[in-house]
UniProtKB/Swiss-Prot annotation:
The gene is pcp. GO terms for cellular component: cytosol. Its main location: cytoplasm. GO terms for biological process: proteolysis. This is Pyrrolidone-carboxylate peptidase.
Length: 214
């Protein structure tokens, strides 16, 4: 049986939970066609997160790899378009590291684009009534670190698709952040199930508007 690898993160930035792992861990063992979903929790740590991700990719040789992270303040599921080759941490990671303007891969390309059918994934979520959009930036913290590193890792594996999805706070988190948007666990889970199915079955992306003016 083939594998789909899905990762989430441990809590960071003073939070007691991370919605990415709270939802991703519920996907463990799910099957789509002939693929089984395997989940892994990554530390919110520069370097170490990629070491663990790369080990999981080598172990499982997955068909699809999707990393999921928290984007508190975003209102919808955001499928990332691009990871850039820079760490520029506004806050320290969970080991106290705070790299500023440091290349993730020295001498690597400036950016890697997602190899997922990102617009088709967004369209499929919207068809089910789930707010979703394409995002043009994964930030410059550990989420972008993982996205860029993932895409660099699979760059020569033409049979592997990979990318990153950001999700909003869960309601229990938003209660501590006045005015912050949130999304229910079951809605996020449904969105990720849709994303995995489309990523596995769709060989190429659709031609649809997904850009931004700023």
């Amino acid at each position: 049986m083939r594998h789909i690898l899905v990762t989430g993160f441990e809590p960071f930035g003073g939070e007691t939970l991370n919605p990415s792992w709270e939802v991703v861990k519920q996907l463990e063992g799910m099957t789509i066609d002939d693929c089984r979903v395997v989940t892994r929790q990554l530390p919110c740590v520069f370097g170490e997160s990629l070491t663990l991700l790369n080990s999981a990719i080598d172990e499982l040789n997955p068909t699809v790899v999707i990393a999921v992270g928290q984007a508190g303040g975003r209102v919808d599921i955001t499928v990332e378009r691009v990871g850039i080759n820079v760490d520029d941490a506004r806050i320290p990671d969970n080991r106290g590291q705070q790299p500023i303007d440091v290349a993730i891969v020295p001498d690597g390309p400036a950016a890697w684009f997602s190899s997922l059918p990102i617009k088709a994934m967004v369209a499929a979520m919207r068809e089910k009534g789930i707010p979703a959009s394409v995002s043009q930036t994964a930030g410059t913290f550990v989420c972008n670190h993982v996205m860029y590193g993932l895409l660099h890792k699979i760059r020569e594996r033409t049979n592997v698709k990979g990318g990153f999805i950001h999700i909003p706070y869960l309601p229990e988190q938003a209660a501590a952040h006045a005015g912050a948007p949130s999304m229910a666990t079951q809605t996020v889970k449904a969105a990720l199930e849709i994303a995995l199915t489309v990523a596995l079955r769709q060989s190429s992306d659709i031609n649809a508007v997904g850009g931004a003016t700023h």
